[in-house]
Amino acid sequence: MPGKHSDSATSELCEKCKENISILVVRAKPICHDCFARYVHTKAIKRLESFRVNFAASPDQQRKILLPLSHGVSSTTLLHILDLHLNTQRSKTNRTGFAISVLVVDEGSLDPARLDKVRERYANHDYASLPLHDVFRLLPDDASLRAFLPESQVQEVCSTQEQLTSLIASLTSATARADVLTTLRTRLIVEHAKQTGCESILWGDSTTRLAEKTLAETAKGRGFSLPWQISDGKSPFDINFHYPLRDVLKKELFSYVDLAEPALSALVYEPQSGATQASMSSKNTTIDDLMKQYFESVEENFPSIVSNVVRTTGKLEVPTGATSNPRCSLCGMPVPDGRFGIHGWGGDQHGGADDAAAVSGGSLCYGCTRSIPQRGTAVASK
């Protein structure tokens, strides 16, 4: 079957090296252990050509990159591959192309022992753990976030933890809560990277995850931001985004975790690919959950479909001068022509930009307006 991926062991010779017995059938090709490990490693490292060792630079002027670690299969695998890559560079040249700073965002249920295990395995890197509510503290002007708090708390002096709890509790749907949490997490990661001198963020998103994000962000009304959320390059936040695992399926990463030496399974806290089940209650089902379930099922037998979604989306280009557009106060993305709020994109005769501009610090893009309708309605009606 075209594009089929199977974990079933076979007695065939590896199609790549023609020497060893294959242990996996990956994208219709039987592959042995060594060739599969090399396949995943090469897919990631070829995306990092710009991070080669710079012999012209002083050793104390090493570039620094941030790796957000969720303890999932993708970010854990990326850390493992980068660690191997740096060790290889160090053994050959006594230098490395970059230094890794690992950030874990604590959303309230983080077990510190997880990070301790990672730090023990990969001891040559810097590590930090920040609570998600620190986003209210780290952003240069937290007034833009405070504008979305319930009115009863806007005038009060609340802790950052109370502000986050109040904001999330005020949202009316599971999709809205998941969307705002993801948005705040990204803002926190970006701000930490900038404040610690990182020039790039290496996201662990796999092909499968990028495909999920493509359809989810489009469905939520934030499709205009896809060139920045899917492709490698300069982000609107004046820091580079890279997706080294963009050519590797999530299912392949789970296979890699099991076959890596030493095994990575003890460091990964995520259900096996394909195990995601949408909630039986539509009230508790998010758009992200549905997209995750869909693409994890598709990649089982038709990985080419998943790859085509990402490949096609990757062709989208950022319009000239887009970064000079007004920004959404929540997600921070440049909004085309400042068309804020529901009316800005609704196809009706109401103006979005002028109405939204009336509220200081509260201008929301269409997607964020859908997640925070109370504030979005207020913005559009002023």
From Swiss-Prot:
Homology family: Belongs to the CTU2/NCS2 family.
Gene3D superfamilies reported in the protein's UniProt record: HUPs
Biological process, per Gene Ontology: protein urmylation; tRNA thio-modification; tRNA wobble position uridine thiolation; tRNA wobble uridine modification
Organism for this UniProt entry: Phaeosphaeria nodorum (strain SN15 / ATCC MYA-4574 / FGSC 10173)
Keyword tags: Cytoplasm, tRNA processing
GO CC aspect terms: cytosol
Primary localization class, coarse: cytoplasm
Name this polypeptide is given: Cytoplasmic tRNA 2-thiolation protein 2
Keyword tRNA processing recorded: yes
Pathway: tRNA modification; 5-methoxycarbonylmethyl-2-thiouridine-tRNA biosynthesis
Pfam family for this entry, one: CTU2
PANTHER family assigned: CYTOPLASMIC TRNA 2-THIOLATION PROTEIN 2
